[in-house]
Amino acid sequence: MTRRGRDLEASPQTYARAGGILYLFIIVAALFGEAFVRGGLIVSGDAAATAQRIAASETLFRAGLAGEMLTCVCDVAMAVILYVLLRPVSRNLALLAALWRVTFVAIYGVAKLFEIAALVLLGQDDYLKAFDPRQLHALAYASLRVHSLGYGLSLLFFGFCCALFGTLIRRSGYLPRALGALLEIGGLGYIAFSLAQMLAPAFAARVLFPWLMLPAFPAELGLGLWLLIKGVDVARWEARESAWREGVA
């Protein structure tokens, strides 16, 4: 590896800038998929209306799906980036948080298969003529419901990831304590929503969702912007990294 390559590898600021860009893309793509695509096309409790809207806006639905699959790629990279940035605080806890984030991505990726299943069921292939249109609409809607529940399940792991990364940020000394505290609260909200969705899905969707998700948005947006614009306090990061290396030497 060249000296320049080693310098880039060793620079926490490089990781921070890349993480900021990726995090902001994740937020934009996720909001597009949730608010503009599913929020505009899925009619709660009405399989036929949902099928009609998706058929009429299939390109939009596919764009949302593609964008969210790209967030999976970005989230795996974010797991590595946040591990590198926060390992001076605690190697083991940073690794645990990163693994929780990768687990979230794996479950979320599987859940997206059910959106693909809905598209297949609403397609025009000849073999689908063996089914009544109402059956296809019901099966497609059921697939979308499974996607929603799978997404909720994935948030359990994402919540633990956010809460633990938030704790590490708050204790780091080279990233804002307030952002860390907000991320901890947001992570607890994700955990509470995920568990509530499994125990009382209707209550979780109608009552808890907006309130439990509220702290998470400013925390994640703030972290993305901070990483992109300010980065980390390199001197403090290097001091903690050096202290750890001396301790294990």
Protein language model features and the residues they cover:
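Hydrophobic, aromatic-enriched alpha-helical segments typical of multi-pass transmembrane helices
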Residues: 1-249
